[in-house]
Amino acid sequence: MRTLNVALGDRSYPIHIGAGLLARPELIVPLLRTPRVAIVTNTVVGPLYLERLTAGLESHGIAVSTVVLPDGEAHKDWTTLNRIFDMLLESRCERSTTLLALGGGVVGDMGGFAAATYQRGMPFMQIPTTLLSQVDSSVGGKTAINHPLGKNMIGAFYQPRLVLADIEVLNTLPDRELSAGLAEVIKYGLIRDPAFYAWLEENIERLRARDPEALAYAIERSCRNKAEVVAADETEQGERALLNLGHTFGHAIETGMGYGEWLHGEAVAAGTMMAAELSRALGWLTDDDVNRIEALFVRAGLPVRAPALGIERYLELMAHDKKVESGRLRLVLLASIGKALMFGDATAGEIGAAISRRCG
């Protein structure tokens, strides 16, 4: 097992990475305020892992309440969130009860948001079961639900007390979901870790083959990058915004196509290619750089072209982005492979041209 620490003073917490961690309730139990938990999972993950987690906790004298949500981004909304609140209230969970989010990014985001708001805040822990959630969404305290006008528009920063990343659960992850997670792994190399990017170019096939050593290394390296950024900028006032490379374009794809049609990682990959096109047009990336980025996404099984929603529709959707400031769209772009920057002076024409080069 490998352990990292997210350094946030008295709200610091560990990230445990390894095989078989779901069968180790002793990693969870000492961090509970009271011997009671509420587990949030979904219809895909629950049948695979809920009984194992519940049995382990109950063997340590922990009382367990559960709710099983419908699966998918299309259900990341108020209606589904209220099912969590219903379970918490009907089970008479208290502010000291710990909520465990067992699932991918949707479960983690909604479970975390429920924990942040139930009785004004209850402790929670992340038990991510997809590659994307293990390397990105479970770390850093971003919680949210979607709105018809934009992704993750209603939420809160609320840190977990523990992240438990069991790499064995990735063996049941569909290939498409694994590739989607690789988009966020590649992102860390692009924005701040060129040596890791070079490693990925050498080892991407090992990751797709689910080589346990390669996966453990990539997850640890990704989480280390994320933890360093979050410790320096928890609420995204500066450097943390760079973690959103490809996300402004990508969220437009997800919203425009309808939540769940494109996986988040797929949209991030296509969105990153749009950001790379704009970075090339501004004179920062070379043709070789863009070709390297495209080649790695393709080898990872990810799309490098986006749906043809129309330039005006893209710009309309991007206007709702959380990085818009004083009406100005600020984009995360690449100065080079391994170095990202925030740029707010791109014209609508320049942005539209970058989009058009990657549409259809």
From Swiss-Prot:
The annotated pathway is: Metabolic intermediate biosynthesis; chorismate biosynthesis; chorismate from D-erythrose 4-phosphate and phosphoenolpyruvate: step 2/7
**Keywords, ordered alphabetically:** Amino-acid biosynthesis, Aromatic amino acid biosynthesis, Cobalt, Cytoplasm, Lyase, Metal-binding, NAD, Nucleotide-binding, Zinc
Q: Which residues bind NAD(+)?
A: 71-76, 105-109, 129-130, 142, 151
Q: What is this protein called?
A: 3-dehydroquinate synthase
MF terms (GO), sorted A to Z: 3-dehydroquinate synthase activity; metal ion binding; nucleotide binding
UniProt similarity note: Belongs to the sugar phosphate cyclases superfamily. Dehydroquinate synthase family.
Principal subcellular localisation of the protein: cytoplasm
The record's catalysed reaction(s) read:
7-phospho-2-dehydro-3-deoxy-D-arabino-heptonate = 3-dehydroquinate + phosphate
* Taxonomic source organism: Azoarcus sp. (strain BH72)
EC number(s): the record gives 4.2.3.4
Q: Cite the Pfam families for this sequence.
A: DHQ_synthase, DHQS_C
Tell me the cofactor note.
Binds 1 divalent metal cation per subunit. Can use either Co(2+) or Zn(2+).
Q: Which residues bind Zn(2+)?
A: E184, H247, H264
Q: Cellular location of this protein? A: Cytoplasm
Report the GO terms under cellular component.
cytoplasm
Which HAMAP family does this entry report, sorted A to Z?
DHQ_synthase
GO BP field: amino acid biosynthetic process; aromatic amino acid family biosynthetic process; chorismate biosynthetic process
